[in-house]
Amino acid sequence: MNLAAMDPTTYDVQLETKRVKLTQLFADFDTPELETFSSEPAHYRMRAEFRVWHEGEDLYYYMFDKELNSKVRCDQFLPASELINKMMPALVELLKPNTILRHRLFQIDFLSTLSGEILVSLLYHKQLDSEWEQQAKILKQTLSTQFNVNLIGRARKQKIIFDKDFVVESLNVAGKQLQYHQIENSFTQPNGKVSVKMLEWAIDVTKNSTGDLLELYCGNGNFSIALAQNFDRVLATELAKPSVESAQYNIKVNQVENLQIIRMSAEDFTEAMAKKRSFRRLEGIDLDSYNCNTIFVDPPRAGLDADTVKLVQGYERIVYISCNPHTLLDNLAELSKTHKITRFALFDQFPYTDHMESGVFLEKR
C-alpha cells in the first residue's frame, strides 16, 4: 500500500485519472458515456487490517508501504472509517499494559459498519488459554462502554468469540433500508457508501426487467437482495459456505421471498444448465421453471471462464460488475459479438490506488 498517495486534496485529480484511463482502455468498444461514482475522500473503508509492532513497553499498529519498502507506524489510518479510527487508540492503550493480551499478538483486524457496529479480531502466534479468555472478556466489557463492539481471538486452529463473529450493516438503498449480515474473515464490499451507489446503479439498469434473474458469484446476497424487487424470481449461486450462510440470514431479515440461493460454483452451475452433469445440491430445484432473461455476474479478478462466457451469452441482458478491467476486456471481446454495451460505469471503491471497479450493462443485439 502506498500510504503517501492518500491525500484527500488530490482526490478529484486521481479520480479523473481513473476515468480517463478506463475510457481509453475500452475505446475499441462502442461504449456509452462513462458514469462515474466517487468515493468519500477519507474514512471510506469499512474494514482494515494492521500488523502489530512490539518495542519495549510500546505497542503500535503498522502497515508495509511498498513504495518506501518499509513498515510505517499507523496510529490513525485516513482511509479507514471514523469508527475504526476512534477504536484504534482506545484499543491499543488497553493492550499496552496487559501482558497477557499483548503477548505474541501480531495482527489486529477491524470490520465496521455505517450503522455503528465494529468487530475487532486479535490474531496470535500462541494458543489462547483460560487466562487469556478472562482478560479478553474484561477488554470487551471495557470497550463496550464506548463502542457497539464484539471481539474475536484467533490462533492456530482456535477462534474464540465475544459475543458475535459478525456485524449487521444497515444501508439505505434507493429509499429502502436493507440489512446485511457480514461475517468476519469473509468477503464484503470494503467501501460502504460506494457499495450503495453500485446497488442503486444495478437497480436502475434493471428497473424495466421482465421474468427472472440469475446471479453467479452472489456472495452474501449483496446484489441479489437489492435486485429482487425488479424480478419475478431470483436464482443465485455462491460456493463459499460462510457467504451462503450470510445470504440466507440476509434473505430472512430483509423478508425477500423470491430469492433462492444454491451453494455451488459458477463452473458447476454452467455444467448443470448445459445438462452435462447432475448435482445433488440441485435436487428439488427445477431449473427449467425459471424464465431468466437477465444474468448478473460479479466474478473474481480472473473474470469469467470460456464456458461461463458462453452461458452468459444466452441471456437477453447482462449486468457485469468487474474488479479487474483487463479480464473484463477479455470477456467483452466475446460478449460484444452477441451483445451491445448500453451502460458503462466506474465505481471508485479503492481511492488512491490503481484499482478500478467497473460495471457494464449489455443487451442482446
Curated annotation (Swiss-Prot):
Domain of life: Bacteria
Record's keyword terms, sorted: Methyltransferase, S-adenosyl-L-methionine, Transferase, tRNA processing
UniProt-annotated catalytic positions: C323, E357
Leader peptide range in chain numbering: none
InterPro entries in UniProt: MeTrfase_TrmA_AS, MeTrfase_TrmA_CS, SAM-dependent_MTases_sf, TrmA_MeTrfase, U5_MeTrfase_fam
One cellular component (GO) term of this entry: cytosol
Presence of keyword Transcription regulation: no
Regions crossing the membrane: none
Keyword S-adenosyl-L-methionine: yes
HAMAP family the UniProt entry points to: RNA_methyltr_TrmA
Protein name per its UniProtKB record: tRNA/tmRNA (uracil-C(5))-methyltransferase
Biological source species: Shewanella halifaxensis (strain HAW-EB4)
Taxonomy of the source species: Bacteria, Pseudomonadati, Pseudomonadota, Gammaproteobacteria, Alteromonadales
